[in-house]
Amino acid sequence: GHRLVCVVWIVLVVMASMIYGFNVEERKLQDMTATLLGILYVVFFSFHIVLIDQTADSDLIWLVFLAAFGTDIMAYFVGMAIGKHKLCPHLSPKKSKEGAVGGVLGSVLFCGIFAYFVKPDMIAECMVIAVVGSVVAQFGDLAASAFKRQMGIKDYGNLIPGHGGILDRFDSVLFTAPMIYYCILFVNEM
């Protein structure tokens, strides 16, 4: 059902993008590719949030947001407080290795509190998902930074002053959702 809808939607987006690309004579292949990847990035990754909601453990949908936001929040504060060693200066000069570790701890803290109150029988699983989710969130954030640098932009928008657009706030969520979905499937198979 819902997986077929996702596949059909992706095929339609790819076809529409190709038709559009062939009809615009001056369209650069790089621009067309970036547009297509951007659409697939948002649609495919965000659809995993819907897939998590369809699982037997739909409460675990919160792990996507807690892992990503716990990572972002704690990485920021730990990085500001004690960050000395640059994580990946050519992509994101303000990120530090200390902040990255703080991000993992933040994800574990947020997801651990959630598990304690909502899924006490799954605390260990939620902690593992928190670590995996945090690492993926940070790679996702760096991948989004690389994409923005390639396109020559600082932020995806300017809706939130100093923070960019909505997509800038949710890029780590988008990367985290598929990984957490597959972690949930793996845990449910055990």
Set out the residue ranges of the language-model regions.
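Membrane-embedded alpha-helical bundles of polytopic integral membrane proteins
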Residues: 1-131
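A short, terminal or domain-edge coil/loop segment
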Residues: 35-43, 118, 143-150, 179-181
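Juxtamembrane helix-loop transition sites at the ends of transmembrane segments
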Residues: 93, 120, 162, 173, ...
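Juxtamembrane boundary at the C-terminal end of a transmembrane helix
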Residues: 182-190
